[in-house]
């Protein structure tokens, strides 16, 4: 029997506000434990929440960016549960009236495009964080408690681990472009739970779903889904039944393990938050927020293809992160050729960032010095090979490309007389290569070009070397 996988993703994104959603405490990552707190975050008796308007507007902006309908009337609710990192014993969330509904985003997998529906986007507060020690007790940090979150719930439209990965990449990119979050999974500002079920191919009814947690990277989401597909199929094929449960992905083993039997919404005893009034959003407010949404990745891709003549693949890679795309735009503003800038950013720059585990803003590279280097290549001042040395110097130490070339003595040798002298010496010492060339062995030319480049420490003008080398050999 063959099965079809059905996946829905729940993505939590921390909003990049200065203060928390219901208190005046700072909402910044990395502070000393339990220092970013107020009596509201600690759940002290008698204190009242105050809604952060910026968090609401960030939620609206994110919802609009993923094509959601914005509610005219929304409200907050209490989600009741007890856990050490939740001092109030309830979480303020949104239950039946979320701020955004009925959205979608488009993904591409294997050259095929597909729309993934968004059920809802709602606002809520984050919980604190427990750190479990090896000494039999846990440490509780309330800093994260009350940080504003949006939860984005997809429709069960995803059919594979690859589609889930593509969905998360696209969602991250869109949210990053809006500026409402930095969406850094390593800092917990983007987190994902996956609801996974399988069903026989052709069956309309959904199977029993498993909720998968502890997915702290996109790769782990993919691995967790792939394992669950296999596990659930083995259970059904052996005559067993799938239990509705919450499971944890174990990164060390690549497997999942039982955490608890899955709760339903009734277990949380939702009821309207009595300390917050309902929120009404008029058209003028919506339009003001809509006007703040920048050009999103899909539209930017189309512009790169149509206006700049870039291949679709280049446009997709360049727009995957806002940082890279903005850097590319600024490099063009510094009058660099679009295709050359694209090639450098997708090639040497990306390779350097991956190897050094850095972001662009953590290097000495700027749009101006990258554009300057590209202009030096186009002018014939440096070769592409020398440009790699210049690039590394700029990335490590910054500065001006032209000045680096002068200081390091990297100017390309394009003087015909100087090159003929060097070529003459090379040919005098490699008469066998001349004979091989005249006998039709083209490899001899490559060898001699290499000798010239070696003698000039890579600074000879390659096209000129090829031209002059052939001329000099044909004279002999």
From Swiss-Prot:
Entry's family note: Belongs to the GatB/GatE family. GatB subfamily.
Protein name: Aspartyl/glutamyl-tRNA(Asn/Gln) amidotransferase subunit B
Keyword ATP-binding: yes
GO molecular-function terms, A-Z: asparaginyl-tRNA synthase (glutamine-hydrolyzing) activity; ATP binding; glutaminyl-tRNA synthase (glutamine-hydrolyzing) activity
Keyword ATP-binding: yes
Entry EC number(s): 6.3.5.-
Coiled coil region boundaries: none
Assembly and binders: Heterotrimer of A, B and C subunits.
Group of enzyme by EC: ligase
InterPro entries per UniProt: Asn/Gln-tRNA_amidoTrfase_suB/E (IPR017959), Asn/Gln-tRNA_Trfase_suB/E_cat (IPR006075), Asn/Gln_amidotransferase (IPR018027), Asn/Gln_tRNA_amidoTrase-B-like (IPR003789), GatB (IPR004413), GatB_C_1 (IPR042114), GatB_Yqey_C_2 (IPR023168), Gln-tRNA_amidoTrfase_suB_CS (IPR017958)
BP terms from Gene Ontology: glutaminyl-tRNAGln biosynthesis via transamidation; translation
Keywords of this entry: ATP-binding, Ligase, Nucleotide-binding, Protein biosynthesis
Pfam families for the chain: GatB_N, GatB_Yqey
Reactions mediated catalytically: L-glutamyl-tRNA(Gln) + L-glutamine + ATP + H2O = L-glutaminyl-tRNA(Gln) + L-glutamate + ADP + phosphate + H(+); L-aspartyl-tRNA(Asn) + L-glutamine + ATP + H2O = L-asparaginyl-tRNA(Asn) + L-glutamate + ADP + phosphate + 2 H(+)
Function: Allows the formation of correctly charged Asn-tRNA(Asn) or Gln-tRNA(Gln) through the transamidation of misacylated Asp-tRNA(Asn) or Glu-tRNA(Gln) in organisms which lack either or both of asparaginyl-tRNA or glutaminyl-tRNA synthetases. The reaction takes place in the presence of glutamine and ATP through an activated phospho-Asp-tRNA(Asn) or phospho-Glu-tRNA(Gln).
